[in-house]
Amino acid sequence: MVEKLERIISQSQNIVFFGGAGVSTESGIPDFRSVDGLYHQKYDYPPETILSHTFWEERPEEFYRFYRDKLIVKGAKPNAAHLRLAKLEREGRLKAVITQNIDGLHQAAGSKTVYELHGSTLRNYCVKCGAVYDVDFIANSTGVPRCPKCGGIIKPDVVLYEEGLDEQVLSGAVSAIRRADTLIIGGTSLVVYPAAGLIRYFRGDHLVVINMQPTNADAEADLCIAKPIGQVLSEDVVLDD
């Protein structure tokens, strides 16, 4: 199966990668929906409640306590999947990474064209004056983080439940998928909409799914591999001419 994947990659000139939480689990970042992910851990409120715009507005101290504890992951490094995708971009084969992750690991690996559908924990801004702050400012603050310049609340640039996706990011992602000759879907269960709905714009030659569990794209895929994506993309395969 990996040999078939490498053959598809070698024949492609416009690859787009669409990824989710499973891409970063090998970097030590938990998958929200896996058996041992955030959705199966015990809190006073379910994560989808805490990570909502309403909760952020009404219970900001609890929101930021959870956010610092569970969403800011210190010391995470790009894994083999991130590094291989960045390499494919440098080689000119991969044109874009579309990610549902908020950890910035694709950019840390060297990827340049990355559409972050759900934003990034690395960017934070004052809701009052617009001043920008890095992740360390949030991590090192206590209680509700406040802007030193104006006193406004500093909000992570992540898409919370009840919030819409960024239109420019969406547009760029759709355009990339429409132009792709190969779409590789990796580390995502394809259950979060509207993000998962973007794959319907693909009209290219090869659809590949690399995910530990079945997805609703499997039936249309040319190739499905049920292995950790870092393992798959790091395997050395020599293709016969």
Q: Which residues make up each language-model segment?
A:
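Conserved catalytic core of sirtuin-type NAD+-dependent deacylases
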Residues: M1-D241
